[in-house]
């Protein structure tokens, strides 16, 4: 074990914590922990226009939810510009950089000319070797790196092998802008050196940047960290991952009902392997992780595998833990809706306006759990799942798990057991209820009312009797009954639901018709 290993995760806070970025963070975390080293976090927020506090918080919360705890204080590049400026001036003094006074308009003119001539554009500044005595005083210069004209740069990548790039293909990149702020290239190199980074593990979309950064390393005389550029994640169709494939933020996967343990396991296997092992705990991942087992081909995002893994991790949780998670989601989302519905009171009891507000809120539901509160009821100040309902959910858990791969699916089914809240009817179940034989439902209510024993066997036998008496198949009468009791067209066994909820609750739901 090498406890001198220091890795870093360095996202730009311009959006959510992307699933590909989360995998990069995971690999850096595991490599550092495997070697008893340090995993550092750096926020690359030099782009003031695009960086947001919300994105920073999304990065923090996403990493914490995944269990990827970092060492030490978070480094913010926006607070380190003086360090970058000093570094640029040092290169200037050592003849490794120069002031460039070429206006941006002239650079763009040259770029356009090269494009028209179908030539690769590399800007060659006329100021590279000019004497400071002729520097203009009316133009604020940038500081550019004096990249060697001859020779080449070799990236020694642990995964990609040796990548050689001719120096003639590398421009004299800007290190310090005219306003005194550092560019990304300078800041990254200075930070990695200052933070003592020993290993850089990142996506291979940074491979081109690596050559330019190596030129800066050489100019400073810094030791170059070990570099590993991993293939990007692709969609199931092999195309570059995009939103249509599921390139969502980690927060979205959390809201979709994935467990952090299962998502980490899935991301780990997305480009890394340990024999035929599919289920890998975080402890095992730390013990086993190495760079030699990384794949060279792009991994494909596969929701079927993700769901299968998540289903496994759901079943590893005990009943109390699962129920607690379900109750938390139910209460959070019910209370979100109550907050939105609360403003309805401003309409002074105007039913038409109230109805309109209610419809808007239904369409605005963003959690995947849509709730329905009749306009006639008085809104509670706060929703809370009762102890009785918690007991129902715990009792039903085995049958709920069989039909669920995510916490969200579990929670949707668990709503069946909220006896103090109105049933939510799917569109299909509404159609079944509207078209069912109302007299048959009344007959079912009468027969179930007479039952003294209300266990699932007794309830099932009673339904068989009713079906036979009406010359119907059991399934024919269970469709409307299921719709009325659950609001769904597919659910756990109605007979089991009946036993758990009891006669009073079942009759109450059947009588809605």
From Swiss-Prot:
> Which reaction(s) are listed as its catalytic activity?
tRNA(Glu) + L-glutamate + ATP = L-glutamyl-tRNA(Glu) + AMP + diphosphate
Provide the primary localization: cytoplasm
List, alphabetically, the InterPro entries matched. aa-tRNA-synth_I_cd-bd (IPR045462), aa-tRNA-synth_I_codon-bd_sub2 (IPR020751), aa_tRNA-synth_I_cd-bd_sf (IPR008925), Glu-tRNA-ligase_bac/mito (IPR004527), Glu/Gln-tRNA-synth (IPR000924), Glu/Gln-tRNA-synth_Ib_cat-dom (IPR020058), GluQ/Sye (IPR049940), GluRS_core (IPR033910)
Gene3D superfamilies documented for this protein: 1.10.10.350, HUPs
Pfam families in the cross-refs: Anticodon_2, tRNA-synt_1c
What keywords would UniProt list here? Aminoacyl-tRNA synthetase, ATP-binding, Cytoplasm, Ligase, Nucleotide-binding, Protein biosynthesis
Query: For binding ATP, which residues are annotated in this chain's numbering?
Result: 243
Protein family membership: Belongs to the class-I aminoacyl-tRNA synthetase family. Glutamate--tRNA ligase type 1 subfamily.
Q: What is this protein called?
A: Glutamate--tRNA ligase 2
């Amino acid at each position: 074990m090498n406890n001198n290993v220091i890795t870093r995760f360095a996202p730009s806070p311009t959006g959510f914590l992307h699933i590909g970025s989360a995998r990069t963070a995971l690999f850096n975390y595991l490599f550092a922990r495997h070697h008893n080293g340090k995993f550092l976090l750096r926020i690359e927020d030099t782009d003031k226009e695009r960086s947001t506090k919300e994105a920073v918080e999304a990065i923090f919360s996403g990493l914490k939810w995944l269990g990827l705890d970092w060492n030490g204080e978070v480094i913010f590049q926006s607070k380190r510009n003086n360090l970058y400026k000093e570094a640029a001036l040092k290169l200037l003094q050592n003849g490794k950089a120069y002031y460039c006074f070429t206006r941006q308009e002239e650079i763009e003119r040259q770029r356009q000319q090269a494009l028209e001539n179908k030539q690769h554009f590399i800007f060659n500044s006329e100021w590279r070797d000019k004497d400071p005595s002729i520097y203009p005083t009316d133009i604020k210069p940038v500081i550019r790196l004096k990249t060697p004209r001859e020779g080449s740069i070799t990236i020694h990548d642990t995964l990609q092998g040796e990548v050689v790039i001719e120096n003639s293909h590398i421009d004299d990149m800007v290190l310090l802008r005219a306003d005194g702020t550092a560019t990304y290239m300078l800041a990254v190199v200075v930070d990695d050196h200052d933070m003592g980074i020993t290993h850089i593990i990142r996506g291979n979309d940074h491979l081109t940047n690596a050559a330019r950064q190596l030129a800066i390393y050489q100019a400073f005389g810094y030791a170059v960290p070990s570099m590993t550029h991993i293939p990007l994640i692709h969609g199931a169709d092999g195309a570059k991952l995009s939103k249509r494939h599921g390139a969502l933020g980690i927060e979205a996967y959390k809201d979709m009902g994935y467990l952090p343990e299962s998502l980490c396991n899935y991301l780990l296997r997305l480009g890394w392997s340990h024999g035929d092992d599919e289920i890998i705990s975080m402890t095992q991942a730390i013990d086993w992780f190495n760079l030699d087992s990384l794949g060279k081909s792009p991994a494909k995002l596969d929701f079927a595998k993700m769901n299968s893994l998540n289903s496994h991790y759901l079943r590893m949780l005990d009943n109390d833990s699962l129920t607690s998670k379900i109750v938390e989601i139910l209460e959070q989302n019910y209370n979100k809706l109550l907050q939105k519905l609360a403003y309805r009171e401003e309409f002074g009891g105007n039913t038409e306006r109230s109805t309109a507000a209610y419809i808007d809120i239904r369409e605005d539901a963003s959690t995947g759990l849509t709730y329905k509160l009749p306009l006639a009821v008085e809104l509670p100040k706060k929703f809370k799942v009762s102890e009785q309902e918690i007991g129902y959910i715990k009792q039903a858990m085995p049958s709920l798990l069989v039909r669920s791969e995510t916490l969200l699916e579990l929670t949707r089914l668990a709503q069946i057991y909220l006896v103090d809240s109105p049933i939510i009817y799917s569109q299909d179940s509404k159609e079944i209820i509207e078209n069912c034989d109302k007299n048959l439902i009344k007959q079912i209510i009468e027969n179930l009312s007479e039952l003294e024993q209300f266990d699932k066997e007794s309830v099932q036998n009673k339904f068989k009797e009713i079906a036979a008496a009406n010359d119907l198949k059991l399934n024919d009468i269970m469709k409307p009954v299921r719709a009325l009791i659950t609001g769904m067209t597919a659910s756990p066994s109605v007979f089991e639901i009946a036993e758990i909820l009891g006669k009073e609750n079942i009759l109450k739901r059947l009588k809605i018709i």
